[in-house]
UniProtKB/Swiss-Prot annotation:
UniProt GO molecular function: lipoyl(octanoyl) transferase activity
Gene that produces this protein: lipB
Full protein name: Octanoyltransferase
Site keyed Lowers pKa of active site Cys: positions: 141
Enzyme Commission no: 2.3.1.181
BPL/LPL catalytic domain span: 35-213
Cross-referenced PANTHER family: LIPOYLTRANSFERASE 2, MITOCHONDRIAL-RELATED, OCTANOYLTRANSFERASE
UniProtKB keywords: Acyltransferase, Cytoplasm, Transferase
Length: 216
């Protein structure tokens, strides 16, 4: 596979979801217009918010949309509702699948494999589950995946719970899965920190997609 250039952003600050979503859309449109433009990777943390996919069931929100205490965004991705917050590492990939494999199922499974490799680096045993998208430790979900795709240019990506307030998931039915238990990496490896996980995420994505990263 020929190496592709990808712009990578790894902010140290906690980012507002909508700002980063708009940035993804800009890079997606740039690739649609000219696929010689670089792919785009964003790795960071968000302020507390909830996001829903295109066909999400609002019944999976256990609070009123009229409640101003919650930031809710309906976005261009599959899947049901999830939660983002500090202490959770989010990775967005805006890339041209025509350069890899024009198969969304392949891409979802590829992301699961990447997450399993990331956690394996920290000696955390985890797995995917037949019939579901994401990664689990035992019966607890540790990572969620949601993607959108337009003309084979992807958007959104995955989140891994590192050391976040899992109680925030009690406000929703996570990913539409009843009685879904969530987990943090820190509960399985006390020695890790989010900056080290971020470094490993970057490394494994670079290896798996043969990227030449350019910071911007």
């Amino acid at each position: 596979m020929v190496n592709r250039t990808a712009i990578i952003k790894q902010p140290d600050n906690i980012s507002f979801f909508n700002d980063v979503y708009k940035l993804q859309k800009e890079y997606q449109e740039s690739l649609i217009l000219d696929n010689s433009n670089p792919d785009f990777i964003w790795i960071g943390e968000h302020q507390l918010c909830y996001t829903l996919g295109r066909g999400s069931n609002y019944d999976n929100l256990l609070f009123s949309l009229n409640d101003d205490n919650y930031d809710v965004f309906k976005i261009d991705r599959g899947g049901e509702v999830t939660c983002h917050m500090p202490g959770q590492l989010v990775t967005y990939l805006v890339l041209d699948l025509k350069n890899f494999n024009k198969d969304l199922n392949w891409y979802l499974r590829k992301i699961e494999e990447i997450i399993i490799k990331i956690l394996g680096t920290f000696n955390i045993d985890c797995h995917s589950r037949d019939g579901f998208t994401g990664v689990w430790i035992g019966n607890k979900k540790i990572a969620s995946i949601g993607i959108g795709c337009k003309r084979w240019i992807t958007i959104n990506g995955f989140s891994i719970n590192i050391d976040c307030e899992l109680e925030n998931f009690n406000k929703i039915v996570p990913c539409g899965i009843e009685n879904c238990l969530m987990a943090n990496m820190i509960d399985y490896n006390k020695n890790l920190n989010i900056q080290e996980v971020k470094r490993i995420v970057k490394k494994i994505i670079q290896e798996e997609f043969n990227f030449d990263f350019v910071s911007k």
